[in-house]
Amino acid sequence: MNAWEVNFDGLVGLTHHYAGLSFGNEASTRHRFQVSNPRQAAKQGLLKMKTLADAGFPQAVIPPHERPFIPVLRQLGFSGSDEQVLEKVARQAPHWLSSVSSASPMWVANAATIAPSADTLDGKVHFTVANLNNKFHRSLEALVTESLLKAIFNDEEKFSVHSALPQVALLGDEGAANHNRLGGHYGEPGMQLFVYGREEGNDTRPSRYPARQTREASEAVARLNQVNPQQVIFAQQNPDVIDQGVFHNDVIAVSNRQVLFCHQQAFARQSQLLANLRARVNGFMAIEVPATQVSVSDTVSTYLFNSQLLSRDDGSMMLVLPQECREHAGVWGYLNELLAADNPISELKVFDLRESMANGGGPACLRLRVVLTEEERRAVNPAVMMNDTLFNALNDWVDRYYRDRLTAADLADPQLLREGREALDVLSQLLNLGSVYPFQREGGGNG
């Protein structure tokens, strides 16, 4: 059956700032306390979406979350009106304010893990929301992510959205950033590669930085998503690269159809894994980047593998990269050799995503891949699909509501909270989502 990969990109939120909240993510730590530009961040993301849509790649948008997220501050013991809660937390414990104001939901590669209908036992598209419990600021995302996915994929005959796994370390799940799908045409059954960093009883794990994904979580997600057990492989990420800042697998590998583009040191027991994939995926091609050409350190600083590998109708592929790759002589030299070599990659497309990159999120972090048949595509909420009208409307919306300068101190401004709620109210109407945000269901509560 014919099917297409649709990229659903996260729209950067109004409170995008640099707080260094993500231990193990070296870009996040390095840019801590710098001044951010939320308006520019949102526009950089929108331009990527529109450019790819114009090039013929189906593209949609997932809206930001409500931030600062006052309900969690109340759970932490801060009371009074919303303004009083903000004032108290800013004075008594500003680190909590930064956490509940994070714009991290923009990285929708961590929103959920997807199983296309060609891979599932019941023939539906399945989504399991990620619990993201390794980081407090990200663990706050699951409930609203679930509401948003249900508003976008609202046909229960075709889509099944599962709640996140229990919030315990044993079941740490980071979503599609640790998941690849390999195979022929998108509509054919594919091989799902779940990548984990640790498992109970296995001493092979990183020592410097946390392994956020567990094998136990990956196995549970595969069950929830009703993936045919014959179409699943579980593989461990190389713990040494996690300790070098590769906090998700999408920082060291990216797949599309029959191609796996990865670093030579991406996986534990890599040669064994690649042999398994060759045996089980028709026409499988591994493009392994040797450490002698691109080091793991250069991989992390340029986000070479946090790229998008997109298929054209003729079978050739475009590699979507952050600007940092072009600015690194060694990486850019390798990429031009790759273009000249015998493989499906025929074009490099570079985007300026500096605002997101400075927090450790490249092109792949910003998108959630969903393979859909024509019938399933028609069942998606049409208001989220990128086109000229939506692009212009979202740019106008960003111009109206987003600040061009934000520091950690600005997060205590009650006006920022009001601006954010008004903006999301307008956006949820624009995207025909209904009341997906807690403040909408509670009737506002600004006072």
From Swiss-Prot:
GO terms for molecular function: N-succinylarginine dihydrolase activity. The keyword S-adenosyl-L-methionine does not apply. Its EC number is 3.5.3.23. Pfam families: AstB (PF04996). It is an enzyme of class 3 (hydrolase). Substrate binds at residues 19-28, 110, 137-138, 212, 250, 359. GO terms for biological process: arginine catabolic process to glutamate; arginine catabolic process to succinate. The active site is at 174, 248, 365 (nucleophile). It catalyses: N(2)-succinyl-L-arginine + 2 H2O + 2 H(+) = N(2)-succinyl-L-ornithine + 2 NH4(+) + CO2. Coiled coil: none annotated. InterPro entries: AstB_sf, SuccinylArg_d-Hdrlase_AstB. The keyword Nucleotide-binding does not apply. Pathway: Amino-acid degradation; L-arginine degradation via AST pathway; L-glutamate and succinate from L-arginine: step 2/5. Keywords: Arginine metabolism, Hydrolase. Belongs to the succinylarginine dihydrolase family. HAMAP family: AstB. Catalyzes the hydrolysis of N(2)-succinylarginine into N(2)-succinylornithine, ammonia and CO(2). Homodimer. This is N-succinylarginine dihydrolase. It comes from Escherichia coli O9:H4 (strain HS). The lineage of its organism: Bacteria, Pseudomonadati, Pseudomonadota, Gammaproteobacteria, Enterobacterales.
